[in-house]
Amino acid sequence: EIGATTSTFGYDDSMRRYLAATGRQDVVNAADKVASYLTADSEVYANPEKYFDQLIEINLSELEPHINGPFTPDRGTPVSKMKAEAEANGWPIKVEWGLIGSCTNSSYEDMSRAASIVRQAVAHGITPKAEFGINPGSEQIRYTIERDGIIADFEKMGTKVFTNACGPCIGQWDREGADKQEKNTIVHSFNRNFSKRADGNPNTHAFVTSPEMVAALAISGRLDFNPI
């Protein structure tokens, strides 16, 4: 959504284990025969700056959660600076809705991480200040998160479970009051947040962030809430 057209991941042990664990041993067997052609040469890994136009190294232990938006996914703000940024730009601080799912950030792992935040809130008797909804990424995801009690965790907090579809990400959301076109803020884990996309309201300030952050912001009901 911010300009990349292609991304590649070299074949390695992690990919091999994943393919085997998901019933694709035949793919593993075929890939193992040409494994050296499915990843970069050793010289590239040793000196990547010699082979690429730009090398970006990210230390995950130092990475701060970001909230992107509104109206574009390439405007990122660290959570520690969101309060000042929102005040400077007149963005509505109150979060009306938190949405997780669609095709992006709706895997079993995504849902389970968000549910861990929800469980902590429920255990402490905290109720969400914003409306909260999830779209499972597929029927398999819906089935497994229901089987493992994750949907029940969400429902204990009053979360609305939508169908396994694109949902609000492509405007399949009959949001009550959207026709009034009032200025408001929503946060979601969808990868697109362009004007009018979710609910048809050009004044809806949609922000993109991780499933965990969506859960935290929906519970707090504030865009400037910093959970870290």
Question: How should these model regions be labeled?
Answer:
Residues E1-I228:
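Fe-S-dependent hydro-lyases/dehydratases of central metabolism
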